[in-house]
Amino acid sequence: MSAIVSKNVIRSITTSFKESLERDSDWCEVSKTSPQNADYGKPLYQKVYAMRYIPAYYFEYCILSYQLNRRAKKYGYEHLEIASLGCGLAPDYYALKGNLIDITFNYSGYDAVHWSTEEFMPSKEANFALNISNASQVAQETIDTYDVFFFPKSISDINDHATDNLEALAEKISSSKKERIFFLNSFISSGCSQVSNVVKLFGVVHNAMISKGFTTSDDHKKTFFGQGPLGRYLISIDSNFDYPPSQRLNCERRDNGKVDCLNCNVIKSPILRNNYIEYNLLEYIKHDN
């Protein structure tokens, strides 16, 4: 058995966001915009971001969720409380929903940015909660309830958002009374040839956990990028990664040669290969003294 990737989730996302984008006429306003904290709040860019990145990120989160399912079942978990820190449009929710088999869960997503285009994502159930909040501001008593912390390509954004954000968050998580905590970490890929600065950021959390008496047999510096060599098409890894060609964005201005759109970020190809995938699952345990 392998990770469950839903064609319906991918098609629903690409269809709804494309239909909304095609009702907008000001694509050029975000043609030079790139993924960063200052731009995530722009609804138009949120739609462009969803079209280009979310299907591939959802694919990656399915792999992580499947691995969590296997690890949690090993210990007999029947229910998990999950916090997604820097959740954005929450594609990890759908990955967890499809891959936690016979394990119920509650999902609490946190993001400092209001992703107003969340309405275009597939429907959710009562186990989903979204909080417009900086991750480091989550109360300790709330942190203490979580079994799983998901960083969906967000740890650098959390670190960059405000001074000492990551340190404050690490202090709270490491102060948890839980005996076992899982981390699902996804990073912007460095090509897996070296430990990138983004991967190193998790060291802040790791060091805090160790300082509070937690141990782990997982290597927090070791990451994975899916099956096969880097550069492999996602559909060759799993045929359910079906990004319909008809859903890709086209611009009449570019087609007619009316403007120079060589570096336009709106009509760039969506992420179809595993180049942007880099992840790990970590388990920390605190034994009674």
Residue ranges and their predicted role:
Residues 1-31:
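N-terminal auxiliary segments of SAM/dcSAM-dependent transferases
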Residues 34-74:
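Class I SAM-dependent methyltransferase Rossmann-like catalytic core
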Residues 77-88:
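Conserved class I S-adenosyl-L-methionine
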Residues 89-102:
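Conserved SAM-binding loop of SAM-dependent methyltransferases across substrates and taxa
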Residues 119-143:
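S-adenosyl-L-methionine
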Residues 146-163:
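A short SAM/SAH-binding and catalytic strip from SAM-dependent methyltransferases
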Residues 177-190:
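Conserved beta-strand signature within the Rossmann-like core of class I S-adenosyl-L-methionine
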Residues 194-289:
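Class I S-adenosyl-L-methionine
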